[in-house]
Amino acid sequence: MKKFSGIIPPVSSTFHRDGTLDKKAMREVADFLINKGVDGLFYLGTGGEFSQMNTAQRMALAEEAVTIVDGRVPVLIGVGSPSTDEAVKLAQHAQAYGADGIVAINPYYWKVAPRNLDDYYQQIARSVTLPVILYNFPDLTGQDLTPETVTRLALQNENIVGIKDTIDSVGHLRTMINTVKSVRPSFSVFCGYDDHLLNTMLLGGDGAITASANFAPELSVGIYRAWREGDLATAATLNKKLLQLPAIYALETPFVSLIKYSMQCVGLPVETYCLPPILEASEEAKDKVHVLLTAQGILPV
């Protein structure tokens, strides 16, 4: 079973202002990220706006993603849903169209008991032969995938091979890494917050799936590569810059439009339009983003 590691951007979905998929921009974003040295691309995550799409839209984007990337790096497709049936259909569709793996957030709206959660993930994992990465984002789902839960799921399902742990806690990441890897050493643990990339590597984790890699992949890629080469000084220097970027996320709720604006700032031809109910970011917020990116050397003075 393939092991995933490194920097895997959760790619922002690109739309025209009428809400249709902007395939040209999608290709340019993929080319940009691959040329920057990322280790994979994750489509239809939180910043990919999967929650505002119907099943047909998600399938169409997944097909386009696989076509555009064309085997240059692994493609992960988000399949999570409040509906187990929909998640299974999306998983099987991703496999049929050539994805390299799937990512499944736990069902949201309901807070489900362990046996319900186990059944949800077992149905997804057993419906495909693809590797499955769990996605923990308790701030949005209302329910934490605890290290004990993840260990149980990993032991029950051989193709559950990793987790994106989007939680602002070094302790949670440490316990996740130590607990799951003690029984599945090959299990991949990715942080979901930019400011925990270096922490994750120091703790024995495997990389990051973080939003800033959409517009500043050179920082997270540089940190990861420096760490792998034993150059902690370079990793620490780059990390000081990366630590400033999460301030962007506090400027709008949700912050998805500001990620797209940041991508615009670095020259990518993307609209800042997002699918409703997410409105375009304010001009005031955009100005603050521009100042921040300039201060960190991502944009020229």
Curated annotation (Swiss-Prot):
Location(s) in or outside the cell: Cytoplasm
Summary of the knockout phenotype: Disruption mutant has reduced ability to catabolize D-xylonic acid. YjhH-yagE double mutant cannot use D-xylonate as the sole source of carbon.
GO molecular-function terms, A-Z: 2-dehydro-3-deoxy-D-pentonate aldolase activity
EC annotation from Swiss-Prot or TrEMBL: 4.1.2.28
Keyword Lyase: yes
Highest taxon of the lineage: Bacteria
Catalytic activity: 2-dehydro-3-deoxy-D-arabinonate = glycolaldehyde + pyruvate
CC annotations in GO: cytosol
Biological process per Gene Ontology, one example term: aldonic acid catabolic process
Coiled-coil intervals, chain numbering: none
Signal peptide extent: none
Active site: residue positions: 46 (charge relay system), 109 (charge relay system), 135 (proton donor), 164 (schiff-base intermediate with substrate)
Primary localization: cytoplasm
Keywords: Cytoplasm, Lyase, Schiff base
The keyword Signal belongs to this UniProt entry's keyword annotation: no
Similarity comment: family membership: Belongs to the DapA family.
UniProt function note: Functions as a 2-dehydro-3-deoxy-D-pentonate aldolase.
Protein name as it appears in the record: Probable 2-dehydro-3-deoxy-D-pentonate aldolase YjhH
